[in-house]
Amino acid sequence: YPIAGHSENWPIRSQNFKRWLAARAFEEMGLAPGAQALEDTLRVLEARATNEGPERAPWLRTGSRDGKIYLDLCDASWRCVEISPLEWRLLERHDAPFIRSSAMRPLPEPEAGESIDTLRTFLNTAEEGDFRLAVAWLVAALRDRGPYPILAINGEQGTGKSNASRILRSLVDPNAAPIRATPRDERDLIVAAYNSHALVF
């Protein structure tokens, strides 16, 4: 739905959409809608979306179409970065079907000109091959569908494994819980995957 000069995507039953709908009703009619009127409207919208609306798969942090990758900055203006084989550009307005979880955190606005080698100073990699594997994981993490590589960071205690994991995660999918405890079962794993693009344990 359109709001403050941009578009946002939220489930119909979410608090964000309900607040927007109530505000629109007040703008149009000058009256606050009652609880039953709001509920009736939500049911109609659900039915129309299910039976009449075009179906589009939602994107969580990343998505792709027409040979381009889109990365949600997760900021208040819902901006995203469009990445093609030759360039990237910041999109202030777009129709990308991004959705968000409450744990997702914003990425900074990208800046041109820096080399990937800048990342070396933040990662304690012993070999050139290890650094290249980390970069390969970052690039693969921008894709919206798998298969994905699994990056296993090994080292003795105190060698910066957790710090490296946080840094790599923060570059593609910052989260309120950058490193999670190992899931106890498949259900925990599915819940974690549903709310995040990248999983770090």
What are these regions (language model features)?
Residues 4-129:
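Segments of Walker-type
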Residues 199-200:
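Hydrophobic positions in the central parallel beta-sheet of the AAA+
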Residues 3-4, 84-195:
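P-loop NTPase catalytic core of nucleic-acid-dependent motor ATPases
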